[in-house]
Amino acid sequence: MEVVPAEIAKKPRTPTSGPVITKLIFAKPINSKAVTGQTTQVSPPVIAGRVLSQSTPGTPSKTITISESGVIGSTLNSTTQTPNKIAISPLKSPNKAVKSTVQTITVGGVSTSQFKTIIPLATAPNVQQIQVPGSKFHYVRLVTATSASSSTQPVSQNPSTNTQPLQQAKPVVVNTTPVRMSVPIVSAQAVKQVVPKPINPTSQIVTTSQPQQRLIMPATPLPQIQPNLTNLPPGTVLAPAPGTGNVGYAVLPAQYVTQLQQSSYVSIASNSTFTGTSGIQTQARLPFNGIIPSESASRPRKPCNCTKSLCLKLYCDCFANGEFCNNCNCTNCYNNLEHENERQKAIKACLDRNPEAFKPKIGKGKEGESDRRHSKGCNCKRSGCLKNYCECYEAKIMCSSICKCIGCKNFEESPERKTLMHLADAAEVRVQQQTAAKTKLSSQISDLLTRPTPALNSGGGKLPFTFVTKEVAEATCNCLLAQAEQADKKGKSKAAAERMILEEFGRCLMSVINSAGKAKSDPCAMNC
């Protein structure tokens, strides 16, 4: 840190006030390479030299100390507080002073501010003299100047410096969202207003007296940051870019983006029709507590006849199989959607007593057994396990060793079982034949009612009755009426008149038949 003292004589503001000597102490750090910040303050060029003062020894002096953070303090012996113009007289000629011209840029950042010294070249194209009317001082404008632009990435704390050539004396619009840059050096005639902005995605605008504006862009394209949306947690809201509208996006997990396969209500069952091999369409079953019934539950279900249990007991087949009652003979039924609360309470009570109450009773056998078997076994005592209320016989499986039945006849070599099975098979075959016959008869009747009368062919030609058209019938009737009038004029008897009319009708029919024969033998005449 080196301190450069300088004394500058200030002109009096009014003729009555005396001159004031101002001492400026410039504090410049040794290392000023890294320049970071958002607010840029540009000081006018300082020309090194000595002060030509005409003040008296009693002239008050003012000392100003300038450091990295700006003006630290000032001591003023005079009461004058208004800003005055500072006149600096060069020590030598203007050309020599230009060579030693030093410009200091104070860049104020978030935490610290640093100085960067720019020394332009003293060549002829780089120096432009400005003549100001009414001024005895020489002003020099720096034509080509370079400034350090700082691009700070929000991800890392270490700033990176990017140097870009900028044009002179033009307003600058700096976008501070991805990149922060410094302001170029302009001449002392331009008045600058630097507006500090907080660190947020806004733009910093530096206005000057000239109306033209230009945007500072880096020489190399900046890498676009593409976020990995797959690693974002659920519920993250993606804000839209500025100027693209108010549409926002939210990240949802994959299990939420699914299409509903079921509607808000459950269709109980469809109308049963006697078609197909089974003869009865089965109903869709509802799983209880995530338990899906096995393939044995696809058997036809007979309607229940409950009267006092409200269809909420396990001996109701509909309730035990996890189905709603539909087309049943039960009375005061609660096994429907209208009494869902009572139904759920009954299901919970049954599961508390027996956790496997609603599991299918007919499941797979043990390992190595391909046949199905009852999960608990039947408890038949008098039916011999040959009635439909035996669950093993109803499922068309044989009783196993876990059954507790008495007098069981539902085993492999039982003659009664074979007879009943044969009868059941014969009855099933008979029902299928009757159903097929009814279906065939109904289809034939519907075909006769819907299909048009086919045109019967006789060797590729038309039959004689197809020639009996409306015109032919009218002509035949006229002939018959003419014969009746002729018989009346001649005074023929009734029998003779009828005979004449019938003979005329036969002649007309023969003419139609002859015409059909001619058309059959001569296709060209028929087509014509």
UniProtKB/Swiss-Prot annotation:
Pfam families: TCR
Residues at which Zn(2+) 3 binds: 311, 325, 330, 333
Similarity field: Belongs to the lin-54 family.
Domain CRC: 300-413
Annotated binding of Zn(2+) 6, by residue: 385, 399, 405, 408
Molecular function per GO: DNA binding; metal ion binding
Residues of the site described as Interaction with DNA: 353
Subcellular location: Nucleus
GO cellular component terms listed in the entry, alphabetical order: nucleus
Region (Disordered): 148-167
Protein name: Protein lin-54 homolog
Crosslink (Glycyl lysine isopeptide (Lys-Gly) (interchain with G-Cter in SUMO2)) position: 136, 418, 438, 440
Binding of Zn(2+) 2, residues: 304, 318, 325, 328
Site feature (Critical for interaction with target DNA) residues: 315, 389
Region listing for DNA-binding, in residue ranges: 302-315, 378-391
Binding site for Zn(2+) 1: 304, 306, 311, 316
Subunit structure: Component of the DREAM complex (also named LINC complex) at least composed of E2F4, E2F5, LIN9, LIN37, LIN52, LIN54, MYBL1, MYBL2, RBL1, RBL2, RBBP4, RBL2, TFDP1 and TFDP2. The complex exists in quiescent cells where it represses cell cycle-dependent genes. It dissociates in S phase when LIN9, LIN37, LIN52 and LIN54 form a subcomplex that binds to MYBL2.
Region (Linker): 362-375
Role noted for this protein: Component of the DREAM complex, a multiprotein complex that can both act as a transcription activator or repressor depending on the context. In G0 phase, the complex binds to more than 800 promoters and is required for repression of E2F target genes. In S phase, the complex selectively binds to the promoters of G2/M genes whose products are required for mitosis and participates in their cell cycle dependent activation. In the complex, acts as a DNA-binding protein that binds the promoter of CDK1 in a sequence-specific manner.
